[in-house]
Structure formats: structure tokens, C-alpha cells
Amino acid sequence: MSFESNEYFDGNVKSIAFQSATLPGTLGVMDIGEYTFDTNAYEFMTVVNGALTVKLPGATDWKTFNAGETFEVEANVSFDVKVKVQTAYLCLYK
């Protein structure tokens, strides 16, 4: 088995794809900045270290998720993220 690595936003977001015991996922890092992500599948995003400030589809307010916290994003939508410190995350896809 091999791992697939990806880079987005000029290398400011990097991830490594893997197959967990239950769902496919990625483990990644984000540099300081603001990003808009598109989803292809339902996502469970957990902050491993650092923090992500997120504006989910249909939301009017931003919400900050810290280490150990998880948010969910529907498939086939876009969501916005602000990163104030380099942050590690785990994303599982359903």
C-alpha cells in the first residue's frame, strides 16, 4: 500500500491520504492564511493541533474549532477556513 500526498494553495495546505479501519481519510497541515475548500464527500474534520475558524455553508457566523474538536461538512459544498497558527487536521470521508 502506498500513500498519496497532495498540495493545495501553492503548498500552504498539504495532506497525506490513507485508509483508516472504517473510512478513507487524510492527515494534513495548513499554514496561516484563508482558504475555500470544495467537498466531494461528507467530511468529518478534526483539529489535531492548532485551530481552524470555519464558516460552514449557510452559516452567517464564523466558528473556531480547537485541538480535539470536530466539525462536519456536507458533500458537494464549499466552506471557508481562516488559519491563524499552523494547524494539523484529520479529515475522514463518508
UniProtKB/Swiss-Prot annotation:
Name which cysteines form disulfide bonds: none
Keyword Transferase in the entry? The reply is: yes
Q: List its EC numbers.
A: 2.4.2.1, 2.4.2.2
| Gene3D superfamilies in UniProt | Jelly Rolls (2.60.120.10)
Which of UniProt's keywords are assigned here? Glycosyltransferase, Transferase
Origin: domain of life: Bacteria
InterPro entries on file? Ppnp (IPR009664), RmlC-like_jellyroll (IPR014710), RmlC_Cupin_sf (IPR011051)
SUPFAM superfamilies hit by this protein: RmlC-like cupins
Top enzyme class: transferase
Q: Which GO terms describe its molecular function?
A: guanosine phosphorylase activity; purine-nucleoside phosphorylase activity; thymidine phosphorylase activity; uridine phosphorylase activity
**One Gene Ontology CC term in the entry:** cytosol
The record lists the catalysed reaction(s) as: a purine D-ribonucleoside + phosphate = a purine nucleobase + alpha-D-ribose 1-phosphate; adenosine + phosphate = alpha-D-ribose 1-phosphate + adenine; cytidine + phosphate = cytosine + alpha-D-ribose 1-phosphate; guanosine + phosphate = alpha-D-ribose 1-phosphate + guanine
Return the similarity comment: Belongs to the nucleoside phosphorylase PpnP family.
Function of the protein: Catalyzes the phosphorolysis of diverse nucleosides, yielding D-ribose 1-phosphate and the respective free bases. Can use uridine, adenosine, guanosine, cytidine, thymidine, inosine and xanthosine as substrates. Also catalyzes the reverse reactions.
Q: What is this protein called?
A: Pyrimidine/purine nucleoside phosphorylase
Source organism of this protein record? Psychromonas ingrahamii (strain DSM 17664 / CCUG 51855 / 37)
